[in-house]
Design a protein with these regions (language model features):
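Rossmann-like adenosine-cofactor binding region
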Residues: 76-172, 188
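Phosphate-binding beta-alpha-beta segment of Rossmann-like dinucleotide-binding domains, i.e.
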Residues: 1-47, 59-62, 66
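Short, structured coil segments at secondary-structure junctions
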Residues: 67, 86-87, 175-177
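C-terminal helix-to-coil terminal segments
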Residues: 1-9, 39, 157, 162-202
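Glycine-rich Rossmann-fold phosphate-binding loop(s) that bind the pyrophosphate
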Residues: 53-54
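Short beta-strand "acidic-cap" motif of Rossmann-like dinucleotide-binding folds
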Residues: 71-73
């Protein structure tokens, strides 16, 4: 019922992180014009890595194709025919996806296998300048390890809607202007709420 909302929120985080919109917005609201400080990156022509190729991952691929991107995905259980139909290259190794993708978006369930999957070791394999989006589940990414990778300049930025502990009012990511954060708003649209109500009533 909320797959469209969740997908659109992940795309919103990707776009706002790529163009540093919240940080730019904040400086202008402080009545300072700092145009030269905010040089973003384009999505056009880039490689997008989708981790978890279920309903939302597939929808994300479908939407991002409009930006003329190359899309790769990692999911051991992926529907190969659907991937081919969407023009998505499936990779068998998550490390390969991390080393090739300019943007990584996570669409995994939270399971014993996926908790902490994005640790310091995996993040070290990321392509330099990568942006990571997590609008799936909290706890899949080690937030401290990601904050360290961003501070070192290896990872450019991140967009996060979910956190290891929720409600979350303190994370190593909150101190970084390169990170865009929202309080688990993936399903928070009028339409998703309406559909959820209809589903319950049915």
């Amino acid at each position: 019922s909320n797959i469209h909302s969740a997908c659109e929120h992940a795309i919103s985080l990707l776009l706002t992180t790529a163009r540093q919109i919240p940080a730019a917005d904040a400086t202008l609201r402080q009545h300072t014009w700092k145009r030269s400080e905010f040089t973003g990156v384009e999505i056009f022509g880039k490689t997008i890595g989708i981790v978890g190729f279920g309903h939302i991952g597939q929808l994300f691929a479908q939407r991002l194709a409009a930006f003329e991107t190359t899309i790769i995905a990692y999911d051991p259980y992926a529907n190969r025919a659907r991937a081919a139909q969407l023009g998505v290259e499936l990779v068998t190794d998550l490390s390969e996806l991390m080393s090739r993708a300019d943007f990584v978006t996570i669409h995994l369930p939270k399971t014993p296998e996926t908790v902490g999957m994005f640790n310091a070791e995996l993040l070290a394999k990321a392509k330099k300048g990568q942006i990571i989006i997590n609008a799936a589940r909290g706890g899949l990414v080690n937030e401290q390890a990601l904050a360290d990778a961003i501070r070192s300049g290896h990872i450019r930025g991140a967009g996060f809607d979910v956190f290891t502990t929720e409600p979350c009012t303190d994370s190593p990511l909150f101190d970084l202007p390169e990170v865009v954060v929202t309080p688990h708003l993936g399903a928070s649209t009028a339409e998703a709420q309406d559909r959820a109500g209809t589903d319950v009533a049915a």
